[in-house]
Amino acid sequence: MKKLPVSKYLQTMRYAAANYVSRECIYPFYASFKVTHVCSLKCSFCNVWREKTPDLVKEDVFNVIDNIANSSIVVLSLEGGDPLVRKDLGEILQYAHQKPFYLFFTTNGHLLHKRPMKEYGKHIDYLHISIDEGHDNLKFFDRLEEFQSYGPEICIQIVVTKETLPVLEEKVKRVYEVNARTVVMPACHLDGTDDFYPDPKDFRAEILRLKKKYLNTITTPKGFLDNINTPHGCSTSSVIIDSDGGLFYPCRTVGKHLYNFTEGSFMKFLKTPEAKEARTAMKECNRSCGWYQYFATDVFASPRSLYSSLSPYILK
């Protein structure tokens, strides 16, 4: 994992302090950028593949990345769809890796064997590979050692439904055996999909049990497990950027495209009355969708949750 400039860490602390003083998360620290909606799969719990949002050309992708680099964001995750479908992905990764943030990369893994992953890996800090029943790739658990050879630290992303919660342990055990990490998240109920969301209390209990049994393997923070069992556990400390550069704000569940990262400063947008009104709407939302990105990113504000998330990397 690369080291960021000291000035970036100091800047992040200032933004965190500003959030604390204002008692609202004005400045986010985590962003996922869906560089494409194209995907080879049609997961039953996902609605991204149903959307027809166009992808940006490479030059506009660079503009989005520049805007992110000049913001409070300290972690950028390139996602999709499956970003491996982009033919210009190598150039995008190389460009993003030069910027002052940690670069995550998430894929369903079905195209890994067709791409120069060891070359791509030089520009990725953390490689997330989604493996579960929904992604129809459970056989990939037999290839974890291969994935580790690409270079970056790998983290297996496991989406759990109410039906698959009882068989989660065998997946976690396999990740543990190869000294890798896994982030386990519930299949939140998205618009236009069937409801596969597991009981949040049962999910919390099982993850805590497995975290204790398979030490330093599951990165899902305890703060997330607590947040999905409270009425308002979500936060705007994380944002999702659509494949056309549009920002879902305050979240992708109930938000709208209020801003586009190809047009003007993101930091200026966050200070607008429109943005503040959206954050207020999030606080008043009673949906409790359990979307991992919005319910887990309090790790940036809570030292206890931060340790819960990072300790598998630090202690193992």
Per-region residue spans from a language model:
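Short, P/G- and charge-enriched loop/turn segments at secondary-structure junctions
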Residues: N19-S22, F224-I228, K276-A278
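Radical SAM enzyme [4Fe-4S]-AdoMet core and its adjacent flexible, acidic
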Residues: L56, K99-Y102, H123-F261, A301
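Flexible, active-site-proximal loop/turn residues at the rims of small-molecule/cofactor binding pockets
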Residues: K52, D82, E133, C188, ...
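Conserved alpha-helical substructure of the radical SAM core
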Residues: K2-E119, H123-Y126, S302, P312-K316
